[in-house]
Design a protein with these regions (language model features):
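N-terminal cap/lid segment of alpha/beta-hydrolase-fold proteins
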Residues: 50-83
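Primarily recognizes the serine-hydrolase "nucleophile elbow" in alpha/beta-hydrolase
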Residues: 160-219
Length: 303
C-alpha cells in the first residue's frame, strides 16, 4: 500500500485531518471512489466511511454546514448533486437518536436522486446518532398515550430557520422545498406542513399526527408511511393512520396519501445499529423509497 495513504490515515486518526478532507484525499490518491473502498477496508475503517467514499463516486458532494437559530448555530449535514442547481430540496428530520449515520445516508440517497438534502441536528448535544438523553421522554410518553404530536415552540422555530437558510441558497429551487422525517422526525415533518404554507411537500415515516385542529392549515401534499407490525393500539402511530386519513380528507384541501406495510416494524426504513446504521434494503423499505420518489415527482410536475 502507498506510504502516503498510511500516513494520511494516521493523521486522520490523530485528528490532524478532518473527515471530509480525509475521504476526498483517499479517493484522489486511490484514483477514484471504486478503488478507494477496498483501501479503506484494508486500513481498518468502518462501513460509514466506505459509504461516504462511494458517495463521492456517485456525482454528489457532501459537507457540514451551520445555520442560525435562536442565537445559536445549528449544525447540519448537506448532500447535493454536483453542479450549480437549482435543485429540488428536502429537509431531512432525524429520529430521536439525533443526526445518525442512517439520516446522513438518507440525505445521500436524496442527493443521488437529484435533490439537495439538508439534515439538521435538532437534538442538543446529540449530533452523532447516540442514545437519546431523556430530554424528550415526556414528549414521547404524551404522544404515545394520546396519538397526537405537539411539537414544542422552540423546535418549530428551528424548522422555520432551516427553511429560511435553504431559501437563501442559490442552488436551492425555492419553489420546491419539502420535508421528510422518521418517527420523532416524522411527527415534525407532519407538523411543519401545518406551520409553513410554502412547504412544497411533506413525507412522514411512522410519525405521529399533529393536533387535528391544525390540519386545515396544511397547504402541501402529505405522504405518510407506516409499519403494520408497529404498535397497533388505537392511539399508536399506525393505529391512528386511518383516522388521520379521514381527518385530512375533511380538514385539509391538499392530498393525503398513506400506506401501511403489513410485515414492516416501526423504523423499517433503517437497518443496522449505530454507528453502522443505514437505509435498509428490505422489501418494505425499497417499496417505500420508490413510493416517496414517485410522490415527489408527481407533485413536482403539478407545480
Amino acid at each position: 500500500m502507498d506510504k502516503s495513504l498510511i500516513e494520511l490515515s494516521e493523521k486522520f486518526r490523530a485528528g490532524q485531518v478532518n473527515r471530509r478532507e480525509f475521504i476526498q484525499r483517499v479517493v484522489i490518491l486511490a484514483g477514484g471512489a471504486a478503488a478507494a473502498v477496498p483501501l479503506l477496508n484494508q486500513l481498518g475503517f468502518d462501513s460509514t466511511l466506505i459509504r461516504e467514499a462511494n458517495a463521492l463516486g456517485s456525482n454528489i458532494e457532501t459537507m457540514d454546514v451551520e445555520f442560525p437559530s435562536g442565537g445559536d448555530l445549528i449544525p447540519a449535514y448537506l448532500a447535493k448533486p454536483l453542479g450549480p442547481g437549482p435543485f429540488r430540496t428536502m429537509i431531512v428530520i432525524h429520529e430521536i437518536f439525533g443526526l445518525s449515520n442512517f439520516i446522513k445516508d438518507v440525505a445521500r440517497l436524496l442527493a443521488r436522486n437529484n435533490y439537495l438534502a439538508l439534515a439538521p441536528c435538532f437534538s442538543e448535544g446529540n449530533c452523532t446518532g447516540g442514545l437519546p438523553d431523556g430530554k424528550h421522554a415526556q414528549w414521547m410518553l404524551d404522544t404515545l398515550q394520546t396519538g397526537v404530536a405537539r411539537v414544542p415552540d422552540d423546535e418549530q422555530d428551528k424548522l422555520r430557520d432551516a427553511y429560511a437558510f435553504l431559501s437563501k441558497r442559490e442552488d436551492v429551487d425555492t419553489d420546491h422545498i419539502g420535508s421528510v422525517g422518521f418517527c420523532w422526525g416524522g411527527a415534525r415533518s407532519f407538523t411543519f406542513a401545518t406551520l409553513n404554507p410554502n412547504l412544497w411537500a411533506a413525507v412522514v415515516f411512522y410519525g405521529s399526527t399533529p393536533p387535528l385542529d391544525d390540519l386545515n392549515n396544511i397547504n402541501s401534499p402529505v405522504l405518510a408511511l407506516y409499519g403494520g407490525l408497529d404498535n397497533a393500539s388505537p392511539t399508536s402511530i399506525t393505529g391512528r393512520a386511518a383516522e388521520t386519513a379521514r381527518e385530512m380528507r375533511d380538514r385539509s384541501p391538499k392530498p393525503f396519501e398513506w400506506e401501511v406495510y403489513n410485515q414492516a416494524v416501526h423504523g423499517f426504513f433503517r437497518a443496522g445499529t449505530p454507528p453502522d446504521d443505514h437505509v435498509a434494503d428490505t422489501r418494505p423499505a425499497l417499496i417505500a423509497k420508490d413510493l416517496m420518489f414517485d410522490f415527489l415527482d408527481r407533485y413536482y410536475d403539478r407545480g
